[in-house]
Amino acid sequence: MKIQLLSDLHLESHPDFRPQPAPGADVLVLAGDIGSYQAGSLLAERGDADFGLARFSPRHGWPVPVLFVPGNHEYDGLDFDEADARLRETCARLGLTWLERETVVMADAAGPVRFIGTTLWSDFDALAPPDRPVARPQPLPVRASPQQTPPDSPLTEQLRARDKAFRAANFYLRKTSGTRGGQPFLAQAVREQSLVCQQWLRAALAQPFDGTTVVITHFAPSLRSADPRYGLTPGTAGFCNALDELLPAAQLWLHGHLHAPSNYRHRGCRVVANPLGYARKGEQAAFAPLLEIDTASLV
């Protein structure tokens, strides 16, 4: 099966971007941040109420099935749960397959392919100094602070690292104007959503499957996907998780979020990202609009 991968098109900034189907592709994967309604959105100015997704609609001419995993920016300027419902309705109306904590199996001549999708979000613990191997099976406590733990304990160091990651993330999250239940959707709420996604993802990957497994997330599963322009800083934990122990359960992991491409193999899994990014930041040179990943090459 040949998979075309696109992410981080940010159509709110690039509304005239016109994607082309990759010749020979069997399916298109949209790995999040396709379009949003943040302040100044050109989609909103032009009256596009479909997050820019109509141009990918199989009902409007896109030639192959389209799988959509929402990114973080789809929720900008909106209530989280209202945006979620609106995105689901949009996908159903346009004929896109919604993959937020959903699994779909597609037939292929070489054998079935299972797509497991979730935004994933971030638990902000990717850079926490571990008191056990990095591939830790359980995340740190959902709610805790360094002031609640012994000052020299490994847990305190982990919580300090998380607190730094929270502060870095909240600097930007406050600008997005996203809310949930009337409250700003900030780092702690993102973490809690991430833990829900992680629990679901672990359960989905644990289900036996005789075929190829492809995971699609918006947030990255590993620090190996970190943007080399910035190195490893507290802000990196808002883009990458440290879920490397899950990689062996899949043959292919597709993601977005970072505006830097990835294409590497780790722990038996190929990890690929193909973001467009922002033109104003000079991030688009490495984007491959017709990128295809052939699952036959994963063996």
Predicted segments with their positions:
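N-terminal active-site segment of His-dependent metallophosphoesterases
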Residues: 1-68, 76-82, 180, 187, ...
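Beta-strand-turn-beta hairpins that frame and shape the catalytic cleft
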Residues: 1-4, 103-117, 161, 265-270
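Active-site neighborhood of phospho(di)ester-bond hydrolases with catalytic His/Asp-centered motifs
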Residues: 5-7, 28-33, 66-72, 97-102, ...
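Active-site environment of divalent metal-dependent phosphoester hydrolases
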Residues: 10-17, 36-39, 73-84, 99, ...
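Soluble or luminal CAZymes and related metallo-dependent hydrolases
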Residues: 45-52, 83, 189-200, 235-239
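A basic- and aromatic-enriched beta-loop-alpha substructure that forms the phosphate/nucleotide-
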Residues: 65-147
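Active-site-proximal loop/helix segment associated with metal-binding centers of metalloenzymes
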Residues: 116-214, 221-225, 229-230
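Binuclear metal-dependent phosphoesterase catalytic core
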Residues: 227, 233-251, 259-299
